[in-house]
Structures are given as C-alpha cells and as structure tokens.
Amino acid sequence: KAKSNRSSPKATIPKYNKTIFLTLTDPEQKESLIIIDNKNKKLKLEKIKNVKNSYIRNFCLSIIQKRLTSTLQDKKTPLIDAFIWNSDLTSENEFYSYGAFLKEKEIKKGIDFLLAELERVKQNGFLPKELEIEKKDTISFYEQSIKSEKTEESDSLVAEYTRNFLENEFVSGPKEEYKIAKQLLPTITVSDLNNHFLNWFKYDDRIVSILLPEKIKDVISEKEFINIEKKVKKYKLSQFKSLYKDELLIKDNLPGSKIIFTKKYPSINTHEFRLENGIKVFLKPTKNKEKSFAFEA
C-alpha cells in the first residue's frame, strides 16, 4: 500500500435524498438519449479488499454490456444502442451509470426495455458461466501484459503514477498484478456480483437525464418515468438468454498452404512470403516501441 502524509480537501457530495430528474431538448441533439447516474462512494485501490471489489465491479460492467449488446441483435428492439459504465464524479464519489439511445417513435417503450433488462439481472442474478469467462479473460489480459511489458504505452504508466499521487493507488506492475489476480479471482462468487450490482439502483441518490431532439413534442415527464419504473419492478422476468449463437465461428479445420516464394528486403528488415493460396505475408520484427516515450500534459 502506498502511504503518504499528503492532505487533500474533502470532496464528498451529500446524498441527494431523491431522484433528480432532467429533461432537455436541443436542436443539435440528433437522437433521444436517457442516462441514469447513481451516486456511490468512490472505490479507491488502496487496499487488496478494494482491488477485489474493483474486479467485481468490472465483471458486472462487462457482463451487462455483453447482455445489452446481445439484445440489440433483435432488430425489433426499441433501442438503437445501450451501455453501462462507471465514472469519476469527485475524489470521493463516482457514478454507476447506464443509458441508451432510443428509437424516435418508441421512447417510452425503449425506457421500459432498458429498465427491464437491468431488472432481469436483479431478479435472476448473473450466470456462473459468465463469471468464469470474465475470470479467464482477466488472467489472459495479465499474461499478455507481462509479455508486452517492454512495449507498454507510456501514457498508461503516466496515468498509473497520476492515480498514485492523487488517489494513493498503489503501483505494482503487471507481474505483481497477475499474482494478485491469481490470488483474488478464485474467491469471487456469483453472489458477490449480484450484491454489487445493486449499486446501480440508488433510487434516492441519482440523476435521471433525458436528452431529446427539439422536434420531439411528446416529452416524457418525471411522473411518467417513475410509473414505467414501478411497472417494470412488477414484471416476472426469466433468466437472460443470449441472442448470439454459442457455436464456433469456424467449424472446419482449415488447410495450410505452402510457401512458394520468399523475398528479403534488407533495407527495411522485412521478409515477404507468398503462399500457394494467393496470400502474401510480410514479416518485420521490430523493437521500435521498446524505447519510445509519449507524454501529454
């Protein structure tokens, strides 16, 4: 853990004790958009416990985003796009948010649809298979990070040191982060995700923003939104089923192809290979990024 005697001003935003509801029309707004920001205490990566919670949060985000993206495969959905995220608000608070672009003639239906997909998770929880995939992807990410450590983009290093200075986040590096992940991930359960997901439902500490093109005349009111929300809570929803087909993209074993021509370009240290099937391959080993540095202030 990084320790410091630095003192910083407290920036905790008091609890709203209500839903702050905003409806805005703008001639430059091209599509109808709803955003629901739920205020939470900021998760600071000062302790191992918080690192575990950050994994849990990120797994929730990733799984829900995949679910929302899957629902968009149905062309009859009233949504154009849907998303879930978290963002910094102050040094002490952050937003847990979700939102969607709504089809122009189906705004209320689109809000109902979005809220129902989130309610589906509240009622049925996450799937063990979903959690397993997230854990595997996380381990793969760190394994790749270790392999590419020498060519890591400098802006990510600068961002990490910045968080260490401003938020007291510890700095560890990919190898140590990999060890921590291997230690923590087996302890994370579906119940952890189900409980953490409730942070996206702060009914008395949130901002609901609806942005509409100026041409939209049927502007939804706060009362109408609350009524939709109450109706959705009464739905009896089944467990999520992805609209993506769970099958291999390539089912057949692909045959190889012989190299029929090779050529070397010494001036640029590149080899050209032409294959029997017509494919050209250019191979250029490089260490160009190993000593590069980028900085932005």
List where the protein language model places each region.
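Proteolytic maturation boundary segments
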Residues: 1-50, 54-55, 61, 65-69, ...
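M16/insulysin-pitrilysin zinc metalloprotease superfamily fold
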Residues: 71, 87-148, 169, 183, ...
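Hydrophobic, mid-to-C-terminal alpha-helical segments
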Residues: 150-162
